[in-house]
Amino acid sequence: MCGIFAYLNYHVPRTRREILETLIKGLQRLEYRGYDSAGVGLDGGNDKDWEANACKIQLIKKKGKVKALDEEVHKQQDMDLDIEFDVHLGIAHTRWATHGEPSPVNSHPQRSDKNNEFIVIHNGIITNYKDLKKFLESKGYDFESETDTETIAKLVKYMYDNWESQDVSFTTLVERVIQQLEGAFALVFKSVHFPGQAVGTRRGSPLLIGVRSEHKLSTDHIPILYRTGKDKKGSCGLSRVDSTTCLFPVEEKAVEYYFASDASAVIEHTNRVIFLEDDDVAAVVDGRLSIHRIKRTARDHPGRAVQTLQMELQQIMKGNFSSFMQKEIFEQPESVVNTMRGRVNFDDYTVNLGGLKDHIKEIQRCRRLILIACGTSYHAGMATRQVLEELTELPVMVELASDFLDRNTPVFRDDVCFFISQSGETADTLMGLRYCKERGALTVGITNTVGSSISRETDCGVHINAGPEIGVASTKAYTSQFVSLVMFALMMCDDRISMQERRKEIMLGLKRLPDLIKEVLSMDDEIQKLATELYHQKSVLIMGRGYHYATCLEGALKIKEITYMHSEGILAGELKHGPLALVDKLMPVIMIIMRDHTYAKCQNALQQVVARQGRPVVICDKEDTETIKNTKRTIKVPHSVDCLQGILSVIPLQLLAFHLAVLRGYDVDFPRNLAKSVTVE
């Protein structure tokens, strides 16, 4: 939801202008997450001595787009942009309103007081903020915003003002604060009392740190420091930070640190990152990065690795396309190849998902598969349920994560639970994962983000390798999730003689899939023409059954998300149980009819719609002469094996949604009220 970005330069001279450009660009890379306002916090003052400027913090906040914030920055009369800083921390934030309407005062950074002694940026929701606010108000603290985050900033100041000794560390203050917080958060703090220092922490929301230096780093594995005991007067109670317990450039050379909600904001600066775990507190003091935890638990890993990201800047740029969504739709021939690369051997008809190989025997012995997800990821589970049931011969449940939790669904030790999420941070799906782990089920993650919470907390998993997806409306991640689940089904039945012919048929379908997707994408002009006939409508119905019911749901979701038209995916078998009442000559209807086991029943549904003066547009097999001959308007897609046909039938709906949104004048990549990464429940 919200986007966090912070930049600390240590002995790397940067002008205020350069620092602001870095912060603004970081926020622009996070725009796809969704937001309604933005802000930055940096050292104020115009003294030639940067250390004097660090005693004052300046906040600039603006409702609306990051571009509006950038314009506001350059309107500041009292800020010399050419002042140079040898050491500086700047923090920046894109806010998605949860507590309080979008406005400058509710935007982040939030401050502790009018002197900006402590400021903080926050992604998440603090569930006990009302109690904390009541306590702080009783101590004389005045609140200016409606946000839960302001309580955090004021709580740090309260701790600082009431600390027994004068030598408290910034890290200790933050540790004490997060012990009082309930809910989900990723936080980065800045203070006039600790110039040039940064402290970041997370619980339930993502946070990573990028490291950039021209010099060799002291380690590629940062050990965790634990509290040694109770705080004593004159002591912070922490394990000692020294050259063996922190990260820094050898010989104390120049270094830059980037705190961010996800990798897209740091990749243009560095590909070396550290992913923080829940309750980690990361501190940069004198250019050295250390990671602290309050308590030691049995499952704690002894350190945090410096990882190298396999991502390039060009992957998160639009290139020659008008929007990220359009680019991602047209990347699907390559993204499905990347999903299969190194995993499917078309010569000997084998599938090897490396992330599952150590657990595949255990999965094959299970009693039930449960697929848990939200939104488009849920539809990917729905789309592959039938082939999973067919090839595994196991009962397969597909659950919306929020409903799964609301029902306290029974889960057993011999269940295998899949958690599907593009970002790997979806809050409801993550809560479902923890629910299933508590009950002893084997957990499997299917994500598109290396180092995400779901990929780390599951027992095993599959990385779909679709590449960064920036557009809020998911497209290529859906088809890659689809292919990943089909590959899993093929892996599950590789030793069953009775399944071998079916496996070969599906694998030949996978081999041809990229070329068939290209063929569907070549129909873009035809679909754009259809969009010009539909964009003024208020509603659209999409009907299908069997493998294509999930396609109807996904197509309807895409249209809802970015065109703001009412759209509904309808199971064709349910037509007579209510939806048929909506059909008349004015209601736009799209039907999906493919030559599979539901063909005759879909033809029956088509006749029912036509009999009510409906004028359906039919997405059908290009070899289906009967449907083409008897229907006035068709979109003809190439034929594939039945369980993969849903990939080819969903792409025309993705293109239709895109063109409808453009014709209606809406921002395709950033639809209103929606965020790419839903990190709060």
From Swiss-Prot:
GO terms for biological process: cellular response to insulin stimulus; circadian regulation of gene expression; fructose 6-phosphate metabolic process; glucosamine biosynthetic process; negative regulation of glycogen biosynthetic process; protein N-linked glycosylation; response to insulin; response to sucrose. Its EC number is 2.6.1.16. The keyword Repeat applies. CDD domains: GFAT, SIS_GlmS_GlmD_1, SIS_GlmS_GlmD_2. Pathway: Nucleotide-sugar biosynthesis; UDP-N-acetyl-alpha-D-glucosamine biosynthesis; alpha-D-glucosamine 6-phosphate from D-fructose 6-phosphate: step 1/1. It catalyses: D-fructose 6-phosphate + L-glutamine = D-glucosamine 6-phosphate + L-glutamate. Residues 359-498, 530-671 form the SIS domain. Homotetramer, may also exist as homodimers. This is Glutamine--fructose-6-phosphate aminotransferase [isomerizing] 1.
